[in-house]
Amino acid sequence: MESFLPLVDENLRSALWFRPEMALTFGTLVLFVLDLVFRRSQARVALLTAGALAVLAAAAGLLAIQPPDAQALFNGMLANDAFAIFFKWLFLAAGALTVIIAAQGRDFPPERIGQFFALLMAIVLGMFMMASATDLLMVYLSLELVSMVSYVLAGFRKGDRKATEGSLKYVIYGGVASGVMLFGMSYLYGLTGTTSLHELGAQLQALQAGSAVSVAATRVALVVAIVFVTAGIGYKVAAVPWHMWCPDVYEGAPTPFTAFLSVGPKAAGFALAIRIFHSALAGPSSPVTGFAESLAGIPWPAVVGVIAAVTMTLGNLTALGQTNLKRLLAYSSIAHAGYTLMGLSAVSDRGMQSVMIYMLVYLVMNVGAFLVVILVAESTGSESILDYRGLSKRHPSAAVAFAIFLFSLTGLPPFAGFVGKWYLFYAVFERIDGPGGAWYAWLALIGALNTAIALYYYVRVIRAMFIDAPYVAEAPPVRLRVGYQVMLGAFSVAILVFGIWWTPMVRWTEASLQLFRG
């Protein structure tokens, strides 16, 4: 009994700092109940939207009073630190924007909007725990929570063949990736005897410092474990070669959820990758970066760099031939995962900060781009690039906003996307004078060439909007709801402001580099 009491005390203490997650859990259940109670109410959409935003606001309010010091929760299963809090704010913003967009659009019938909001809260909860996970068990459980609910929402359109096909592919690829990652985790546990990410790092260092025989005996198992865990994370961020689910899911899913999927789970995947690669898979550290340069004889930063180069190249080259804008943005999202992996491959504080800055900027410009896709699709009933011809004449403000988003996605100044991409390249440039500098120089060159490729297919859309004549003689006008107009204006202003004045982003991310180290 006496040995049990400290566990109870620890859980009660942890619960005080687990309140944002508790608010999301309770809110998810309440939204399901409200959906049943107000099933026949004329104001059900407004009530459920207010309920979903209230849940997110409650979580935000509780998150705002979190302590700044890093600490372990629930006996080391989770960590409460500035790094996790940064990503949680990002997830709340993505969730709130998705709720507002979905409430105004036509993708969800009124009788099903409550289910969507409740399931969306569940995904946000899972992403919260992904950002805080410091134990392999919690890593897997949080990843599965996000994945399982995402499968449902990807196929949320009843009777839609593309939605069903995309959801099925998502389930198949997700199930395989989940099993592969779990298999890799089992190897890590077998090698070290622990599931704690921080203890894993210490145990792996001890293994590598052992005799030549013991190191050789464990090297193969360790390599398999690293490859399999990397595959699980690569699936979540849509990196090559684990990206094949992405285009079909993005095209078939309701567009508000596609916008959320392109940012939220991707950011959660990168948060998880940073925790794992800078905690669990940390071998003997470099005096330059303070992080591991190799593990089991493999220079894993270079491996991540290769994945980054292949991901951005394949994503951009495939996007060149797309005629459906959602599929184009899907391949663009794959390419942006490659750019972000550049920061991860730098294995430095600057690299981590560049990932955080880029995810923050990517949230605004990508959700903004999908918002334009929604409003054009509602007017034309199509997502083809042909329907964007002459958009500048049918709705000039929408065309200008979309051009801003696309130029920002390219990474051109003076837009916020340039700042995000600059920090990614800066993190790589810092490594050129150190070990493996030649490889980092090549990675920077590949990234620059891919930016030029991306400019081509983004400009193709811009040309259609401002230069090409409408595809049909009587092109339907594009009508914007007031809410959409406000959001497009806010996104455009944010991209322009942070493209010129990025100091707040840099300071926030610098203050958020405090990871719980065990």
Curated annotation (Swiss-Prot):
Pfam families (alphabetical): Proton_antipo_M
One BP term from GO: ATP synthesis coupled electron transport
Keywords linked to the UniProt accession: Cell inner membrane, Cell membrane, Membrane, NAD, Quinone, Translocase, Transmembrane, Transmembrane helix, Transport, Ubiquinone
Transmembrane segments: 18-38, 45-65, 82-102, 113-133, 136-156, 171-191, 220-240, 254-274, 295-315, 328-348, 355-375, 399-419, 439-459, 486-506
Signal peptide: none
E.C. no: 7.1.1.-
Record's catalysed reaction(s): a quinone + NADH + 5 H(+)(in) = a quinol + NAD(+) + 4 H(+)(out)
UniProt entry tagged with the keyword Transmembrane: yes
Keyword Membrane part of the UniProt annotation: yes
Enzyme class at the top of the EC tree: translocase
Superkingdom: Bacteria
Membrane topology of the entry: Multi-pass membrane protein
A cellular component annotation (GO) from this entry: plasma membrane
InterPro entries for this protein: NADH-Q_OxRdtase_suN/2, ND/Mrp_TM
Subcellular location: Cell inner membrane
Annotated NCBIfam families: NDH_I_N
Function: NDH-1 shuttles electrons from NADH, via FMN and iron-sulfur (Fe-S) centers, to quinones in the respiratory chain. The immediate electron acceptor for the enzyme in this species is believed to be ubiquinone. Couples the redox reaction to proton translocation (for every two electrons transferred, four hydrogen ions are translocated across the cytoplasmic membrane), and thus conserves the redox energy in a proton gradient.
Assembly behavior: NDH-1 is composed of 14 different subunits. Subunits NuoA, H, J, K, L, M, N constitute the membrane sector of the complex.
Family from the record: Belongs to the complex I subunit 2 family.
Protein's UniProt name: NADH-quinone oxidoreductase subunit N
Lineage of the species this protein comes from: Bacteria, Pseudomonadati, Myxococcota, Myxococcia, Myxococcales
Gene name of this polypeptide: nuoN
